[in-house]
């Protein structure tokens, strides 16, 4: 799973290699394919919320039940790789679940770019105690704060807030909020949309009540009607099958399906190497900010000046005819691979009997 790089050197290495070899490099950020995020992205792209000016995302997940299950480097490793990494590194070291979906909604490097950030963290209380419990020794310095907040300002004057907290007993939360000039979307802790009656009518949905306003979330029936009208085309295609297959509720399956679909049809991938670098670089940039009294830190332009060339984030689709041709070709390749696999498996079975 994510992230793909943990510092600027690794981010630039992946960008440079992708450009040098002209090969795709996609970050497997499954949260971009969750139902609420995809439907809300479609609404934002259709102007339901007006202009989106602020967004929030997070990874808030108490890892207390999981610390002892991460890979350990031998019997003497009392911490495991993840707790040790948090001990040694400050900043948002797991930003992409929260940042990825909101970056798409704000057209990052497709008309806008993240320009500067300021990061702040709490002191480490839980982190230090976890180390001391496992090692039996005092922990003098646990770099990662119990809760980290990063504020980002974009070139076009938008603001993104990203939070990271794997220590405190908060319920699981990725936030995912979009604040627009005409509407609001919120996923955690309660899914809801806030639109006034005029804006809901403008979006093509007739409200169930006459006094609908944006001071609270809309009634359930109005929300269901809005979601039905703006159901994302990708969910229409893969949604039901994804629920059957599963994988984080099905979003893993949708992500994998889109990766295969784009490769089969020769299309740009949903997330490119520049997304990867922009989302992952938050870790080191936030660390730089906090280590310098929470100073503003500039984002590198991984696109080398091309961030405004593409206008608006979009998913790529093939024509029905091209889809059909690609699918038939894929079926033939799959059949050959299955046939080859069956022969090899039979040969291995014979060898094993000997």
Residue positions per predicted region:
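Rossmann-fold NAD(P)-binding glycine/threonine-rich loop
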Residues: 4-24
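A short catalytic or substrate-binding loop motif that flags glycine-/basic-rich loops and adjacent residues
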Residues: 96-97, 141-146, 154-155, 169-170
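Active-site beta-strand termini and strand-to-loop segments that position acidic
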Residues: 150-156, 180
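Predominantly a Rossmann-like dinucleotide-binding segment in NAD(P)-dependent oxidoreductases
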Residues: 21-26, 31-142
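C-terminal helical cap and adjacent loop that interface with cofactors, partners, or active-site loops
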Residues: 103, 171-179, 186-189, 194-354
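Short glycine/serine/proline-enriched coil/turn segments at secondary-structure junctions
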Residues: 63-65, 168-171
